[in-house]
Amino acid sequence: MRSVPRRERHRRLRNAKDCACRYHSPTPQIFDRLELLNQQLNYALPVGIISQAIITTDNYLGYSLSHYLFSGKRTAAFRSLDDISLWIEKGSLRQLIVDMEALPVSCIEALNQLRALSWQQSDIQIYLLVSDKTSAITQFIRMAGRFFVLSRRQNLASVREALLSASKPRLSESFSRTDWLMIETLAQGASLKEIARQQSVPYHRVVYRLKQLITLLNLPHRQSFLRLIQQLNVTFHDIF
């Protein structure tokens, strides 16, 4: 009498397993082993030289990249850009992979740090993992600096291939220093007239450059640009 329920239970378990294998998710899933992954991620940093650094607060992604993408003693995962300052000073860092969806700071702040780093250490290749859910944000990040922008939805094999084949020259940034200063000031809540006074330029020149940026970002009008700046000025978990 018990054989029928037992067979039914095995059938349900088998079907559930098959569904899990067929299911494909573009982003890493969060499951019960997160605490274990967190403990595994906090392993002792490699002794000596680190040439590749991964920046993310996503424990699953950080563990996967550091163990399966590079799997070497010269790779380490960190939770913020501030954590890699020591390795930047040592001059051993050659590749920086930043998960733009999982940082403890806003997009504007992170990009500001990365822009400064790219100017100070031009020999460091900076790769940004970006979600393509919002095209305006992706385009903004592409224009923000001399970075390689990769889709976060790629599998590890595709990411590895992109990292190994990225030998072509990086495109020069689309935002000038003056543009970026205006963007930062707008993010702080300043008006265009205040920006014109701070930069000691005519108001119409600021308006003209803003229109150019709106066109480059494929946005319909000024209000959409200001909304984009507001989105970029909050933490990443709130954006995506």
Swiss-Prot record:
Subcellular location: Fimbrium
Swiss-Prot/TrEMBL keywords: Fimbrium
Domain of life the protein comes from: Bacteria
An annotated GO cellular component: pilus
Protein name: Fimbriae Y protein
Record gene name: fimY
